[in-house]
Regions:
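Residue-level preference for the first positions of well-ordered beta-strands
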Residues: 4-6, 36, 109-111, 183-185
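Conserved P-loop
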Residues: 2-102
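Helix-adjacent hinge/juxtasegments
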Residues: 65-165
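Residue-level signal for inorganic ion chemistry
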Residues: 19, 58, 113, 189, ...
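Short, glycine/serine-rich, charged loops/turns that create anion-binding
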Residues: 11-12, 44-46, 118, 191-192, ...
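Short, well-ordered coil/turn elements that cap or connect secondary structure elements
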Residues: 32-34, 62-64, 107, 179-181, ...
Length: 241
């Protein structure tokens, strides 16, 4: 694996701006101008005004920074091999001027900013083409896991059918991408601290995102939470002992 970083934060925390600076720092430090600086956008564009406004805002943030954009709301595995992915060069006004181009060679050794993990998970769960959509309504199962501190040496835990699929369809492609790229920075949302209890389906989504955060953090060189624009290092710093 090359360089893998996870950046989390609440809404309007400054996580996107920090993640952009971080991937640009990695790109500059590597001194590999022949490699690509890639923005991997996972938001599903439904053509509505809210989606258009968010796209315009993020395009403005990245204006003239040299990013190439790949739009892929779900099915990251296809991104690693499929030649029907749409890619665009940042900077043009209006909608993305997209053209079909295989991206496998582009990803190899590239510096990739993925924004964001929460959208990717939601799309895999709720879009008709999402590969988790068929199992997310299945009831949880109870399993016993070894736990020496629990009575009898075992602990009852809930297991959801999509847990293994989260690893297969989201985590594994992300780790493959990180291995192929020079650097991968993943942006995600901090949605775990408000103390509220939501409907079961929402809580199930929150749980799934938490699992992904935990698994990615275990593999990452660097984990940062951004609060009020300030990066709080949770794990490591790439390039530092």
């Amino acid at each position: 694996m090359k360089q893998l970083a996870l950046v989390t934060g609440g809404a309007a925390s400054g996580k996107s701006a920090y993640a952009e600076r971080r991937i640009q720092e990695m790109f500059s430090a590597a001194k590999l101008p022949e490699k690509r600086l890639i923005y991997l956008a996972t938001m599903f564009n439904d053509g509505g005004p809210e989606a258009a406004a968010r796209i315009r805002r993020h395009r403005a943030l990245r204006a003239e920074k040299g990013f190439e954009t790949i739009e892929k709301p779900c099915d990251l595995e296809a991104l690693l091999s499929d030649n029907r992915i749409w890619k665009s060069q940042e900077g043009a006004a209006g909608e993305y001027p997209a053209a079909p181009k295989g991206v496998s060679a582009d990803l190899q050794g590239g510096f990739i900013l993925l924004e964001d993990l929460g959208n990717l998970l939601a799309n895999e769960r709720y879009l008709s083409e999402g590969r988790l959509s068929g199992v997310c309504a299945d009831p949880p199962m109870r399993v016993e896991e070894p736990n020496l501190s629990a009575p009898g040496g075992n602990e009852d835990r809930q297991y959801y059918p999509e847990d293994a699929l989260l690893r297969e369809y989201i985590l594994a492609p992300l780790l493959t991408m990180a291995e192929a790229a020079s650097a991968l920075v993943i942006v995600s949302n901090e949605i775990f601290s408000d103390g509220e209890t939501y409907p079961p389906e929402t809580m199930r989504y929150i749980r799934a995102l938490g699992l992904l955060h935990r698994w990615i953090a275990e593999e990452a060189d660097e984990v940062t939470e951004v609060v009020c624009g300030l990066p709080l290092m949770k794990k490591g710093r790439i390039g530092e002992g």
